[in-house]
């Protein structure tokens, strides 16, 4: 509860600066560390081929077994790597690095890669997206320890990219929803990874699919959002993706057709959350954070009054989302810190 109070007091400053102080970052580090090796409760999301697949989460996934589920564990690790990189001299960075060094072993990460090779649809594509985002951050941590971790992590990146390259040509339609299966968010993350690593073949495939799925979309039905357990805005994720695909002029024209008259309707106001302890209803906290970061990303590709429309709405959503990030309930705290750090440190922008 102490952390919640501290963050609530600082919300206004976070919005004004759109950045984290070392102290604030330390609160998110503590939150991420608290779930890093927390094996239970756990939702392993496994497909059982044989009786031998019945194992504990740690046996199944020797690195990413904490934080309730695989993808949350991945972005919990990402949170630590990103904050260690942004605040290398922070007192808490020593503890965070030590925890990561215990987890990022060559043997453990190879087992993670082997699992992804065996179960090719596991965490498709939401978990894949976060795993590649972690890869971007590891590559950017340009010191001896970071290079060691990045080298050990390479097999995970390689199999995810191989799985994506095999899957995407067969995916004929986008998946439009407000939670894990949605396609616009992972396509955006994968484009960022392909550009960070220079994988032009992968980038070309991703842009082709983004154009195929979304180029012709018009008059997005904003009145249909949100659904009751969304943590994504399908419409804003799509718009945030397409700024990565189009030139600035083409993007503005497309966006004006996608959101006619740049009227955001329901998307302009934060959503309320009735129960922060309910694992599905608390998704709506993540929705507020997701709306805020996508709106900021979209605003970065616009000018003048149109830019202001998105920035004003983003501020409202940021305040609402940060207020509920530290709830004291593991239902939200096992994952919401990563969404907040993604927003507050300007990822993808």
Task: Say what each PLM segment does.
Residues 7-16:
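Hydrophobic h-region of N-terminal signal peptides that target proteins for export
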Residues 18-20, 34, 74-90, 129-145, ...:
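Well-ordered alpha-helical scaffold segments within catalytic/enzyme domains
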Residues 17-22, 57-74, 113-129, 170-183, ...:
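Solvent-exposed loop and edge beta-strand segments that line ligand/cofactor-binding
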Residues 28-41, 95-114, 152-173, 201-222, ...:
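Long, well-ordered core segments of solenoidal/helical folds
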Residues 17-65, 329:
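Low-complexity, Ser/Thr/Pro/Gly-enriched N-terminal "stalk/linker" regions
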Residues 1-7:
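Sec-dependent signal peptide recognition
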Residues 59, 74, 83-197:
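Extended ligand-binding groove/face enriched in aromatic
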Residues 278-325:
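C-terminal hydrophobic structural anchor segments
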